[in-house]
Amino acid sequence: MANAVVVLDNGAHTAKVGLANQDEPHVVPNCIMKAKSERRRAFVGNQIDECRDTSALYYILAFQRGYLLNWHTQKTVWDYIFSKDGIGCSLENRNIVITEPQMNFQSIQEATLEILFEEYKVDGVYKTTAADLAAFNYVADSEERTTMESLNCIIIDVGYSFTHVVPFVLGRRVLQGIRRIDMGGKALTNQLKELISYRHLNVMDESHVVNQIKEDVCFVAEDFKQAMQVHYSEEKRREVTVDYVLPDFTTVKRGYVRVPGKPREDEEQQQMVSLCNERFTVPELLFNPSDIGVQQVGIPEAVADCLKACPWEAHRELLLNILIVGGSAQFPGFLPRLKRDLRALVPDDLEVSLICPEDPVRYAWYGGKEVATSPNFEEFVYTQDDYEEYGFQGINQR
């Protein structure tokens, strides 16, 4: 039954989860957190909202370098998700749509199935990737009513640990065309921590706060060299510079950008950091990872290289259907910069069109909802009976 299916986009940073008959997923931090202010308690998932002081928050992550390695942490988070404090339903006797990383290790896939079938007693599993679900949702959203079997598109998933470029030709992933860049939201937050700690004050233990700063003030420069000219003009520097008021967890629970000329009460007593080129040099790493010593190409070059591994007759449609998902796709200026750089790398007679949905974080989950409610969903589910008869190997035949 479609209304019994759980859809879980199990990301390294957040898990997007809900029933297929619900309109919106719950977005839950996929980690356990500990705070200095409450040493006796661990916060799981959205319980962090109950923490009075999130300074120096310590994270215990289920994912390491993009892969699910800490199963104790993951099971703790899943237990919370499926409790009354989460989505309020058990996995027992339900089908589940669950995502995994591209090119996932076999041992991790085996452990995932084992826990789902033996610990949570699910009826069946549909295992896929976030890129596949995004492609499925893209078809569902298509005004031309393209079918999955005729879809030619490129999915750029700017995730927490990695950025993946995944081409689809006639609805199937072109495995030899998949490209991975070891740069994502986590690396950007770490770089911003380094810059603020070096130039202003030590925030190396403040991942939670710095991640909020990144989300609030960072943007992608359309022309990086021109943007760096801010240092040659005081007027340009003032245009880019913002003062960010740091939280003190007493009067200010979450940091914010100070509005010049409109100070809030007691604002002058609050601790602030002044940010200028940090605002655009941090997201620049998505386009030039070598800036911090990661010897890999940026996203535009990865897309151009992925194109070379695809049939030439599909190139035109692939470039017309480039879909960008993931949290870091939300930086202002990301799309114009990517289009500009990619335009210079592909033939002039081919048009480039980029699409970023309104909600790139939840987009794959909505694709999972479409999959779970499709008429032939049951045909692709790996059931408890299949698992008992064939074990892990049988799912690869689906």
UniProtKB/Swiss-Prot annotation:
<dbReference type="GO" id="GO:0070828">
    <property type="term" value="P:heterochromatin organization"/>
</dbReference>
<dbReference type="GO" id="GO:0045815">
    <property type="term" value="P:transcription initiation-coupled chromatin remodeling"/>
</dbReference>
<keyword id="KW-0963">Cytoplasm</keyword>
<dbReference type="GO" id="GO:0031491">
    <property type="term" value="F:nucleosome binding"/>
</dbReference>
<keyword id="KW-0206">Cytoskeleton</keyword>
<dbReference type="GO" id="GO:0005737">
    <property type="term" value="C:cytoplasm"/>
</dbReference>
<dbReference type="GO" id="GO:0005634">
    <property type="term" value="C:nucleus"/>
</dbReference>
<dbReference type="InterPro" id="IPR004000">
    <property type="entry name" value="Actin"/>
</dbReference>
<dbReference type="GO" id="GO:0003682">
    <property type="term" value="F:chromatin binding"/>
</dbReference>
<dbReference type="GO" id="GO:0005856">
    <property type="term" value="C:cytoskeleton"/>
</dbReference>
<dbReference type="InterPro" id="IPR043129">
    <property type="entry name" value="ATPase_NBD"/>
</dbReference>
<dbReference type="GO" id="GO:0000785">
    <property type="term" value="C:chromatin"/>
</dbReference>
<comment type="similarity">
    <text>Belongs to the actin family. ARP6 subfamily.</text>
</comment>
<dbReference type="Pfam" id="PF00022">
    <property type="entry name" value="Actin"/>
</dbReference>
<dbReference type="GO" id="GO:0000812">
    <property type="term" value="C:Swr1 complex"/>
</dbReference>
<keyword id="KW-0539">Nucleus</keyword>
<protein>
    <recommendedName>
        <fullName>Actin-related protein 6</fullName>
    </recommendedName>
</protein>
